[in-house]
Amino acid sequence: MSKSAVSPMMQQYLGIKAQHTDKLVFYRMGDFYELFLDDAVEAAKLLDITLTTRGQMDGVPIKMAGVPFHAAEQYLARLVKLGKSVAICEQVGEVGAGKGPVERKVVRIVTPGTLTDSALLEDKETNRIVAVSPDKKYIGLAWASLQSGEFKTKLTTADKLNDELARLQAAEILLPDSKNAPQLQTASGVTRLNAWQFAADAGEKLLTEYFGCQDLRGFGLDSKEHAVSIGAAGALLNYIRLTQNLMPQHLDGLSLETDSQYIGMDAATRRNLEITQTLSGKKTPTLFSILDGCATHMGSRLLALWLHHPLRNRAHIRARQEAVTALESQYEPLQCHLKSIADIERIAARIAVGNARPRDLASLRDSLFELAQIDLSATGSSLLETLKAVFPETLPVAETLKAAVMPEPSVWLKDGNVINHGFHPELDELRRIQNHGDEFLLDLEAKERERTGLSTLKVEFNRVHGFYIELSKTQAEQAPADYQRRQTLKNAERFITPELKAFEDKVLTAQDQALALEKQLFDGVLKNLRTALPQLQKAAKAAAALDVLSTFSALAKERNFVRPEFADYPVVHIENGRHPVVEQQVRHFTANHTDLDHKHRLMLLTGPNMGGKSTYMRQVALIVLLAHTGCFVPADAATIGPVDQIFTRIGASDDLASNRSTFMVEMSETAYILHHATEQSIVLMDEVGRGTSTFDGLALAHAIAEHLLQKNKSFSLFATHYFELTYLPEAHAAAVNMHLSALEQGRDIVFLHQIQPGPAGKSYGIAVAKLAGLPVRALKAAQKHLNGLENQAAANRPQLDIFSTMPSEKGDEPNVDCFVDKAEEKHFEGILAAALENLDPDSLTPREALSELYRLKDLCKSVS
């Protein structure tokens, strides 16, 4: 395509677009951002805006679409949510300053991971960008948040990469454009960069220059050992510099993160526990949404961070617990202060990248003064004392802003009225000229009326024609000779005089000069604030931590959460534990105990469908998780030993993108658990093996349970409908049978949701199907088939020889016939016990008692 065939403006556009082929270009033209050619077609489709044409290029109409400048943020937000990146091209030259189009250049690039504008961000979500740099053995990760200044790195392995990305909840992922780039479970938000940008040498050079140090050892990074992490961090910092068109000034150091800092949770566990997102992808009801009572958006974001990063350091946990206890008496006054605090964290980020607005500074000023008034004296908490000590450090910044910024400044700097009176003498003088213009005009009008004797004479102003003297048509002919005609209207004539023209020039010049000076002064204020960014970030973090801790304190009081105890020996003891989310969704929640220790490491959980097995297991995991955030827990008491990881294998779903069936997903997640769980891990296994044939599933479930008992030795909750597995406690002393109870009332079933010792008597599957609304005919047929299958299973005992090849804990072969007999005996005992439990002998008539006796006899025949 020949550039000579297009206009100079389009030549300019094509030159800019050639540098940003992978992005949409917002090209500023007056009060609009315009998009051209393929960008226009894509934007029109994504944003539902009008696609039109303007001019031609090589004989073809140029496609064009545009959005108003003042509404650009909402369109940018929509594009970013769709994973698009946008290059913002502004007019930087003066209109009419020379030949050709006005000078334009890309001033910033908006990408999903580098947002700072509040209109483009979710208030309660942290926006992170992650760089991934692989080598043959390890993968280096680096991530940053431009809103908080967070900048961290970590070494990981390929099998843990997707779990790390799930933990970080990356909005954008930077990958090298090479064949050895790792495979991700998500394709959205991925940006490919040239592989050389991840080079460790270049990364170390850029990082040492940025931090002003000779090497990175002070950050815990060794040039050889952490080469891939350094390469990732360097690529990330360079990408931020390119997109923001400047080097960020607020990244808070570079820290090396290790697995030992936090309790590990893989992607499946975070999903199954519904920490910040439900299984259906919604934001409520989740653990975060139920707990979040924070007064500030900073606090809400920190709460989500703590929930995804439960601590392992007991000293840090106890410090949080002590603060929660101390804040019980301080909650109300503290909340009054916190509710007045703006989002200091994000305001600081906008100051750092140069796009803070006047009202950002006013909000920052008011918030800093508010924080300085917080009184946390005599709390006895060292953590609270440390947090409070941060706030006085920002008072000089607040005083500077008080002097520099109007109490209620304009939204936009271009509208003026931003810099405070008395801050700069020259600005005050220019404003005086503007503001006292009304007095001059009134005096001039009175003087001219007296001089001319014309009663209809008025002195007025509008933005198009400036200042003028207006006379009615009838008196216009009597205008003095020094009146120069400016505009003719239907019923009036407008004039200008040398005196009025001189005043107009003075006022308009003063206005332009004042706006230019305000911009200069505002930029100076921002420059000074950048030197105070470390103090502002510390204040933001301290305010957020106070907010979360006070929220924890309120939860303890309002929802009867208790302070958990920590032990150095293996134990998970919970008295009357409750599911923190479910108990808020139902009228009555049944609390349950949990007892796991060195003697009992695996709880074999049986019971009816809808009986509450999954809820109970999640409840245990969530209580353990909450305890390690410093939050109190929903229970009467809790004691928890060392925990390194939490694993879950719950639910079923296909992975069509990876061509994996439901059963394949289940086995992959199970394999990961068996390879990584340790003696200090919490493992939840729900209905393992149900995705294949009955005996295959039973064999796998048995083998997995034994592996957890003998090899992993983790604290495991193992829910199953395979009643044959209930023999495990006889072969393995570390296993214990528990069940969720239910009560049959005639042909109906009542779920008691109560954990009780021993195996369940039956699954009540048909009763649950009845509750679901299956037709009566289908239910009767199911009952008939069930009776037949149970009789057939009893007659074909040799089919259960699948366990004959499995060694017991002692290494000998289990007696299969004995296993079958005992399992069936337990099954029969459970059914008989359930039937007897429903009888009330004192209320039966003789005839009813005889009838019940016959029914029990028939029941014995059906299961014998």
From Swiss-Prot:
Cellular-component GO terms for this entry: cytosol
Pfam family, one: MutS_III
Gene Ontology MF, one: damaged DNA binding
Disulfide bonds: none
GO BP: mismatch repair
Keywords: ATP-binding, DNA damage, DNA repair, DNA-binding, Nucleotide-binding
Tagged with keyword DNA damage: yes
Residues binding ATP, per UniProt: G607, P608, N609, M610, G611, G612, K613, S614
Keyword ATP-binding: yes
Function, in words: This protein is involved in the repair of mismatches in DNA. It is possible that it carries out the mismatch recognition step. This protein has a weak ATPase activity.
Similarity annotation: Belongs to the DNA mismatch repair MutS family.
Protein name from the UniProt record: DNA mismatch repair protein MutS
Upper classification of the organism: Bacteria, Pseudomonadati, Pseudomonadota, Betaproteobacteria, Neisseriales
Encoding gene, per UniProt annotation: mutS
